[in-house]
């Protein structure tokens, strides 16, 4: 049975939020301000799930999705919304979370940072699975809210040269003896050739190695093999091919390995660093802490302008990489690094640090609750 609803807002997953006789309904495919006819797909005590059957009154910001896999692939959830409106919708979700979850209101909202909407991803984890009823091996993102792998022929958010590899990768994996024991291919891009990391649960035999080498030559990529955790990743042959990127505005070059964390969108990353530097308003006598510093993405620009910079990160390999990047940019005498689990720190932890008068905190999605609780009262 079809139900007519008015979409009041959008959640962080891109679902429309409506009310039906006072009950919250999450509507797949609905946009804020629209009137839609929906079909209820799941009913829970406190909410319902629904999908749009017909848009009766469309949003002026509704657009035709550019990706042929939109609606099935879970990689993107808001392509039916104009790109600028997507940014505004995400900002409203953030403000709502501050209000309803954090019980706070932002005193100031900075202008959003925007970059290219297509071909921007320089990092991705692609699932690999043989599905006989779909014709063989699938390589791609998961289907929306599912553990199934989407049947993808292309991906518009990947660089075109990498999107073009999806079908050849399917053919390659289909031929591997370890086809059913290779669950993931991780892609990472710097300013050189793409790197592909094959996660394998069994040793790779000589015949499979030969196929991987042939793929390297034909498609101008480099392979890494990862038998266990990220620290076990190693190049298929020869020396490790270190990836790199440049922050042109600061004259800094960074090196990293394909399994080490970097920002997905290099264009946005450059703008984020610029924004952070403006907000810090650095003076030559500042002593700055950079928490969750990673490989030194923010640390090194800060070190160029501050008297002392202290980068802290939970991953020892990333701290080693940060030190290498500092040395490579001639900043070793202006920066120091330390390994610390920033999710488990004592209340007096800040008292154990070198003297600092400014902090930059760039946590992962898990947040920085322990850090915030330990902040000195004057911070």
Features from the language model and the residues they span:
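Internal alpha/beta scaffold segment
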Residues: 148-183, 189-193, 202-227
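Extended interfacial segments that mediate partner engagement and assembly in macromolecular machines
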Residues: 53-65, 71-182
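Rossmann-like S-adenosyl-L-methionine
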Residues: 12, 175, 203-379
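Short, acidic/hydrophobic/Gly-rich beta-strand patch recurrent on exposed beta strands
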Residues: 16-21, 140-143, 322
């Amino acid at each position: 049975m079809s139900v007519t609803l008015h979409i009041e807002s959008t959640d962080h997953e891109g679902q429309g939020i409506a009310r039906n006789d006072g009950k919250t309904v999450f509507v797949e495919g609905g946009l804020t301000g629209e009137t839609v006819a929906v079909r209820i797909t799941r009913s829970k005590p406190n909410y319902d799930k629904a999908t749009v059957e017909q848009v009766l009154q469309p949003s002026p910001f509704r657009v035709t999705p550019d990706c042929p896999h939109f609606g099935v692939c879970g990689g993107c959830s808001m392509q039916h919304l104009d790109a600028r409106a997507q940014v505004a919708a995400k900002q409203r979700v953030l403000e709502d979370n501050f209000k309803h979850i954090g019980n706070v209101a932002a005193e100031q909202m900075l202008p959003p940072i925007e970059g290219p909407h297509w071909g921007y991803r320089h990092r991705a984890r692609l699932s690999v699975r043989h599905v006989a009823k779909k014709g063989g091996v699938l390589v791609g993102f998961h289907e929306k809210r599912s553990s199934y792998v989407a049947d993808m022929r292309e991906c518009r958010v990947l660089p075109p040269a990498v999107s073009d590899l999806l079908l050849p990768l399917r053919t390659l994996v289909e031929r591997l003896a370890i086809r059913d024991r290779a669950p993931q291919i991780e892609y990472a891009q710097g300013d050189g050739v793409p790197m592909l990391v094959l996660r394998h649960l069994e040793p790779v035999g000589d015949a499979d190695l030969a196929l991987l080498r042939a793929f390297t030559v034909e498609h101008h990529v480099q392979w890494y093999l990862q038998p266990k955790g990220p620290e076990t990743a190693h190049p298929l042959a020869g020396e490790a091919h270190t990836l790199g990127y440049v922050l042109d505005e600061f004259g800094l070059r960074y090196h990293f390995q394909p399994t080490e964390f970097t920002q997905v969108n290099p264009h946005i990353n450059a703008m984020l660093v610029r924004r952070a530097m403006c907000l810090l308003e650095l003076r030559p006598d500042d002593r700055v802490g950079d928490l969750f510093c990673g490989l030194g993405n923010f640390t090194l620009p800060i070190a160029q302008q501050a008297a002392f910079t202290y980068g802290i990160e939970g991953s020892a390999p990333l701290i080693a990489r940060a030190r290498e990047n500092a040395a490579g940019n001639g900043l070793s005498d202006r920066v120091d690094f330390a390994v610390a689990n920033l999710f488990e720190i004592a209340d007096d932890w800040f008292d154990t640090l070198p003297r600092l008068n400014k902090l930059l905190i760039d946590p992962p999605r898990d947040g920085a609750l322990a850090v915030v609780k330990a902040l000195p009262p004057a911070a």
